[in-house]
UniProtKB/Swiss-Prot annotation:
Its cofactor is Zn(2+). A motif ('KMSKS' region) lies at residues 284-288. Keywords: ATP-binding, Ligase, Metal-binding, Nucleotide-binding, Zinc. One of its GO terms (molecular function) is cysteine-glucosaminylinositol ligase activity. Belongs to the class-I aminoacyl-tRNA synthetase family. MshC subfamily. InterPro entries: Cys-tRNA/MSH_ligase, Mycothiol_ligase_MshC, Rossmann-like_a/b/a_fold, tRNA-synt_1_cat_dom. SUPFAM superfamilies: Nucleotidylyl transferase. The gene is mshC. Catalyzes the ATP-dependent condensation of GlcN-Ins and L-cysteine to form L-Cys-GlcN-Ins. It comes from Nocardiopsis dassonvillei (strain ATCC 23218 / DSM 43111 / CIP 107115 / JCM 7437 / KCTC 9190 / NBRC 14626 / NCTC 10488 / NRRL B-5397 / IMRU 509) (Actinomadura dassonvillei). This is L-cysteine:1D-myo-inositol 2-amino-2-deoxy-alpha-D-glucopyranoside ligase. It catalyses: 1D-myo-inositol 2-amino-2-deoxy-alpha-D-glucopyranoside + L-cysteine + ATP = 1D-myo-inositol 2-(L-cysteinylamino)-2-deoxy-alpha-D-glucopyranoside + AMP + diphosphate + H(+). Its EC number is 6.3.1.13. A motif ('HIGH' region) lies at residues 45-55.
Length: 407
């Protein structure tokens, strides 16, 4: 599946330092240690509606990881999926009288446009579930053959009893797991399961639903194994960083990690990064609640994508936050102030700004601190001036390359 057009990256003098990020599994900030090529997987959208700011905030976060790694001299193998077959997609297609394939294609196109406008570096591999059904079913069969899965009325379930490390990502107790599993797409009440926490690997064909031939019979994949199979295929086991929104910690990432351990004997990733939820009207933005601010709608209203990006960068990726009417005016004012400073013929030395932005982003992607460093330079430039004629160009390149904001 094609991704979207890549932004050009302006080279910076020197190189950045190693990236440290908060690892969900250990609860600690850890130094990432990729080799020459870093490997990263981010869970993608289910394309039954346009991308909202919660999605954009997640992919902005992984874009910062990508930029910091590149600045430190690493090539980056970035893989992102799109869940182009799933129950919510089928339900929306039926409710609106649209073929599910057409709905998915339409919303994926809008997503691509949004990501390109926000200057998100595209994945090395942008992979749909539909195009990956064979490798997903093969992984499910591989897990079945280890004895870790069982059949129930033609469906294939992973037996949580066969995953001794289960809980290593989320660190939740069983009661919390059961509650979240039921809220987030699981079926803990299904009769016949060995354990309420057992999860679906392969769903046997149902009348009126799409299905594919496989070694497991005709059907379609369960949710969690889709990402496990795509990540294993494109990144191999034990890659550098796996993640997504914090609502994916459990069950999605916990169950995916168990599937990979079962199939390979090791972890799926060395680090697990999760992004705080963006709220509106006191609730997290979600398609099911309908309390959404769409990136595409903001663009249609004439909002500069650089301003949208700056509004999100003002928030640390791990902290939940609320979108309010004050976000865009504040980001617009910041962009105008920066542009005014960048238009000066000379300004204060920019080398400390580059160093400060690098240091902030390398330490758990502290984008608010990075913005503050540029703010301080711009304020000094506008009030006191400066003598360095090359400073505006270096700050412009710093903001462009590390923060992804083109002014």
């Amino acid at each position: 599946m094609r991704s979207w057009s890549a932004p050009d990256i302006v080279p910076l003098p020197g190189t950045g330092g190693p990236l440290r990020v908060h690892d969900t599994a250990t609860g600690r900030i850890r130094t990432t240690t990729p080799g020459p090529r870093a490997g990263m997987y981010a869970c993608g959208i289910t394309p039954y509606d346009a991308a909202h700011l919660g999605h954009a905030f997640t992919y902005l976060t992984f874009d910062l990881v990508n930029r910091v790694w590149r600045d430190a001299g690493h090539d980056v193998n970035y893989v992102q999926n799109t869940t182009d077959i799933d129950d919510p997609l089928l339900e929306r297609a039926e409710a609106t009288g649209v073929d599910w394939r057409d709905l998915a294609h339409r919303e994926i196109d809008v997503f691509r446009e949004d990501m390109a406008a926000l200057r998100i570096i595209p994945p090395t591999s942008y992979v749909g579930v539909v195009e990956s059904v064979d490798l997903i079913s093969d992984l499910a069969a591989r897990i079945r053959d280890t004895g870790a899965a069982y059949e129930l009325d033609g469906d294939l379930y992973f037996s949580v009893a066969e995953a001794p490390e289960f809980g290593e990502i989320s660190n939740l107790d069983r009661g919390q797991m059961l509650e979240l599993f039921g809220e987030r797409g699981g079926d803990p009440q299904r009769t016949g399961k060995k354990d309420p926490l057992d999860w679906l690997l392969w769903r046997a064909e149902r009348p009126g639903e799409p299905a594919w031939d496989s070694p497991l019979g005709r059907g379609r994949p369960g949710w969690h194994i889709e990402c496990s199979a795509i990540a294993l295929d494109r990144l191999g086991p034990a890659f550098d960083l796996n993640g997504g929104g914090s609502d994916l910690i459990f069950p999605h990432h916990e169950m995916g990690a168990a599937e990979t351990r079962c199939a390979t004997g090791g972890p799926n990733a060395h680090n697990h990064l999760h992004v705080g939820m963006v709220g509106l009207d006191g609730e997290k933005m979600s398609k099911s609640l309908g309390n959404l601010v769409f990136v595409s709608k903001l663009r249609q209203q004439g909002v500069d994508p650089a301003v949208i990006r700056l509004a999100m960068l003002a928030h640390h990726y791990r902290a939940p936050w609320e979108w309010t009417d004050a976000e865009l005016p504040a980001a617009t004012a910041r962009a105008e102030r920066w542009r005014s400073a960048l238009a000066l013929g000379a300004a204060p030395d920019a080398a400390p700004v580059l160093a400060a932005v690098r240091a902030a982003l390398s330490e758990d992607l502290d984008s608010p601190a990075a913005l503050a460093a540029v703010d301080a330079w711009a304020d000094t430039a506008l009030t006191e001036g400066g003598a360095d004629t090359g400073a505006p160009a270096l700050v412009r390149a710093t903001v462009d390359t590390l923060l992804g904001v083109r002014l």
